[in-house]
């Protein structure tokens, strides 16, 4: 289908924990289609979701870093970003559906907030905004070093076309 539609490049949307086996296999095919990952990095700042602890555990395992503090977390993220870069990634996408406020925070406070999050599994909404701000700034710097594009979807409206949703399901 891709060849018939004259697709030259296919960018997939992948979580930070993604495996690039499929990308490698696709690049070995003789169809002359470039397959690159793009990073969907929502999980990096999804502190209030029940799956965040699992995300941190999997990140630790895949990066080879035991995550005990914010510095460990950021180093583990950077290791994974290197793998994305090696696989040809040039785009990172962050969904901020609930909106976003940037609140500058110093590294010491961000470290304390992350430590609290690791210990208790909870931080307040104000603390969440601060930690998200700090980590998004870190991510932006990482992307800039790699010459990537960073997309922020702030307050995006989802599921707005009821006719398409009826015909196509959740993709509509």
Protein language model features and the residues they cover:
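Metal-cofactor-binding active-site regions of metalloenzymes
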Residues: 1-146
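Catalytic core of soluble alpha/beta enzymes
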Residues: 101-115, 134, 152-172
